[in-house]
Amino acid sequence: MPNVIISADSTCDLSPEQREHYQVRSFPFHIEFRGRDHLDNIDITPQVLFDGFYEDKSLPQTGACSPEAYRQHFAELTADGSKVVHFNLGSALSSAYENANAAAADMEGVYVIDGKSLSTGIGLQVLAACRMRDAGMSAADIAREASELHNRSHASFVLDTMEFLAAGGRCPTLVAYLGGKLSCRPGILVDNQSGAMKVGKLYRGKQEKVLERYVSDTLARYTDIVKDEIFITHSGVSDEVAAAVRKLLEERGFRTIYTTTASCTISSHCGPGTLGILFMTETPSA
């Protein structure tokens, strides 16, 4: 049986250690910042982007890679006869899936999955696919099952500031200004059927108390959460805040809790201080 390679856009936000352990091949997005082209989380970090914004309102340009870039990536992975299952950032958020699909159209043994999510909402799907690979499943069978994983993957997060959304034209400046004055922190939900984002509950108060309510609200929506693993993914919160959220999840019986930092692509849109919990359910649910 040919070797099966699991590959994913860098926006799946798995840590370097996870990518190495599970042998996931990462495809980095490009970040254009201050006139230079960078590779996401390779030669630029979210903190550099945040610093640039607060220094002189510099904003990065992010975007999906071209079909040709994907074609080259897939060609390198399949050169020895390997088969590839590749996970993309959700098609509702980016043209990455469309471009990767175009690249794979005339290539044998390359299967492209629309993650219909973002960040470790896709990372969870990638880990599930890796376990299928390690169990000896073929690339075609993995792709068939993986194409439905988004129905069980749940992603949400809470913003600490709306400045970056406003600067990027994703919410009115006045709304962001008033949100800051009123200490409003909007919850953002990812629709796991379409992959689109929508505004959820609006929280007010200090970050730690807001995150405590957010965790409680989020977990209360589901009765069949898989307790084997859960992600805490953030765009730069203090160790104390991350530890407090971890404690909440430990108290609720989660066995493995991963803490990862969001990629530049994700972080540049949500701004610093954003945090989310991302997990799977046993059965498909919105």
Predicted segment positions?
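N-terminal glycine-rich anion-binding loop in soluble enzyme alpha/beta folds
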Residues: 5-64
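Glycine-rich phosphate- or other oxyanion-binding loops that anchor nucleotides, phosphorylated ligands
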Residues: 57-58, 64-90, 99, 143
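Acidic, metal-coordinating catalytic cores used for nucleic-acid/nucleotide bond scission
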Residues: 93
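Short beta-strand->loop
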Residues: 88-89, 113-116
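Mixed-charge interfacial surface used for oligomerization/domain docking
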Residues: 3-5, 11-25, 30, 82, ...
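Hydrophobic residues in alpha-helical segments
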Residues: 53-54, 78, 133
